[in-house]
Amino acid sequence: MSFETKAFNSIYASITIARCQIRIGRTVIAKALCAGIGKLRENTDEGQLGSIDANVRLLATDEPDDEIKTGTVIEILQNGQDTKTGWVKARVGGRFPVGGLTRLALEAVNE
């Protein structure tokens, strides 16, 4: 077990507010970490743009067989949110595998 994996498991066990779930289609990854999801909507000359400031970390072993690719739309449910209405959509802007973990940098879904 790598240092990163041990740290992930320790944080997951001790800081319950940082826990989240990730949903990719019908697949749900129940054990993930997220420090929070910051949402911002700003007015520009082109109209309103939404942005999200968030990073999500999960164990590489929990990642689906066909790894989560950049551009994939996922949903995140932070600990304590309603399971019916609390899911937040985000697009994977970057994927960074390190020491048994995968970090996903998220951005807004502008549809």
Task: Name these PLM-found stretches.
Residues A54-P64:
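Short alpha-helix capping/helix-loop boundary micro-motifs
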Residues M1-N55, G94-E111:
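N-terminal disorder-to-order initiation segments that are Gly/Lys/Arg-biased
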Residues D65-E111:
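Short, compact, well-ordered microdomains
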